[in-house]
Curated annotation (Swiss-Prot):
Pfam families: KRAB, zf-C2H2, zf-C2H2_4. The keyword Zinc-finger applies. It comes from Homo sapiens (Human). This is Zinc finger protein 124. It comes from the Eukaryota. Gene3D superfamilies: 6.10.140.140, Classic Zinc Finger (3.30.160.60). May be involved in transcriptional regulation.
Amino acid sequence: MSGHPGSWEMNSVAFEDVAVNFTQEEWALLDPSQKNLYRDVMQETFRNLASIGNKGEDQSIEDQYKNSSRNLRHIISHSGNNPYGCEECGKKPCTCKQCQKTSLSVTRVHRDTVMHTGNGHYGCTICEKVFNIPSSFQIHQRNHTGEKPYECMECGKALGFSRSLNRHKRIHTGEKRYECKQCGKAFSRSSHLRDHERTHTGEKPYECKHCGKAFRYSNCLHYHERTHTGEKPYVCMECGKAFSCLSSLQGHIKAHAGEEPYPCKQCGKAFRYASSLQKHEKTHIAQKPYVCNNCGKGFRCSSSLRDHERTHTGEKPYECQKCGKAFSRASTLWKHKKTHTGEKPYKCKKM
């Protein structure tokens, strides 16, 4: 039988032939994404077989589904946490139908069945990842094709995986089952809770391989790495300017529209970016939290401190590509470039 999904003959396969279970030891080795993929594969396999009315010799699909995990529970009932064979009655979790060989691992029996039947592996031609069963292969392909077969009945949003739809539904129901034991704040996703818990522990597990800087969240590391690679995937459709993160592009688009959605409550001045408003608000309270270690001078924002520190170090990182002259500040380089272009953007209004 070929490795193409279309060649899998569903009516010749019982659920227990394709149901892949794990011992406790094997399950512990899987990461969360692999466990989620496993659940999706088993659910979809069950639905596919049930939809065509496929039955085993003496059992219904439902019975086969229950019995595939019952064997493993039987062992554990005698041996406690021991995921291996039962010492009291000698029963093992599963048996290969082709050669009657028993095994402590359901996955090993599944591989043995594949060997007997000649059902080959299902290889992804895009990323070369290999799968043993077609439903697992089909679900994986959605990562490449962008197929989204699961639609939310509430808002119509489509998602690629059933677990993603289940998570999305909590937005509508307001369900927040994951609660922080430290402060009581609740979240709709376990991953959001884990991220939040780091604000209490101070843990920063994501480290940049280029400079060693550590981050609390993986997406922050991802954005930071672009400062090293120069990658700017977000492009303005109006002027072609590119940005390393989506929020920067969104702020830039507001500049074209003339939108300034962040007003200062103290004086009413409006800004395009929340960060610009935060810097401005410090001018009202005369706060200068960024202090130079060399001379003690204080600054309202970290970028001003960095510019100032170069007066001590003599560093000039901004170089003109035209003549090679270097400057300590980006704004000074920008002004210098106009000497080459002849640009004179400032006109006297009285003329």
